[in-house]
Amino acid sequence: MVAAAMALVVPATAQKVNDAAILAKLNKSDVEAADAKKSAKASVWVNRAKVYTDALMEPTKSLSTSLDATFLNYTMGTPSETSTDDKGRQLLIYPWVKVYVENNRVAAWDQTKVIKDGLFEVIVEAAAKAIELDEKTVAKVKPILDTAINYYSQLGEVSTYIPNFEVAIDAFVKAATLQQSKIYTQVDPKYYFFAGQMAAFLGADNKQYFVDGEKYLDKARELNYSDETGNLYYYLFHCYYGQREDDKQNLIKAKETLLEG
């Protein structure tokens, strides 16, 4: 049935991202947000959160993990280039994104272009402003934030797979930050745990990541993150131990963390 349905669909010739039209919407929203009269309306900020989230999603909206790669011919068109990486994964290069394929399934992707910088910051600001002006907008704002959170959560997962831990950390922290909105009762601690885990991996080459990892893992612990194998304490130990030369107390904390876990 799927094959028959696909046979009726004409493959796209290339990935189409109408960035000009999207930028026009963003620019219109910028003008409205800067207008004293219009910016006093909650609806302006709801729309602002929406159009900026749409811009965030657009380049990768046709992608999901485990998607049959054959469908990409119909949703994204013919890649401009194909190759194989050092792990034997097929790479499909599109104008806006590089797709990793394994066993004819989409395994991950790396977005190589953005429609506009600073989308995340505007989404956070617009959502908060809409609710500040009218709490009744929560019903409209929540689906928008849910979409953005899902985007960053998925970005974190596929970036971990590639692996591109720097991007993964940033994505997981942004997902957690979006959940700090008053719309949600609590941030899902897994986002801080995953960010801390990735930071612990990177700490050997850049000690700042040990510092960041400690911060993220502490937040996960404060939010009652738990797992049966005690991985939080394992990675927190490495973050403390990696900072042992900066402060002797970190060595003590490292030992205490092992005992606690």
Language model regions located:
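Alpha-solenoid helical repeat scaffolds
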Residues: 44-47, 142-143, 153-154, 186-194, ...
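Karyopherin-beta/Importin-beta family HEAT-repeat alpha-solenoid scaffold
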Residues: 96, 235-236
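Short N-terminal segments immediately surrounding and downstream of signal-peptide cleavage
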Residues: 16-34
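Tandem amphipathic alpha-helical repeat scaffolds
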Residues: 196-198, 238
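Helix-capping and short linker residues that terminate individual alpha-solenoid repeat units
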Residues: 34, 135-136, 180-181, 221, ...
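Short coil/linker segments at helix-helix boundaries
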Residues: 39, 51-170, 179-189, 201-212, ...
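Canonical positions in the second alpha-helix
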Residues: 130, 175, 220, 260-261
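Bacterial Sec-dependent N-terminal signal peptides
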Residues: 1-22
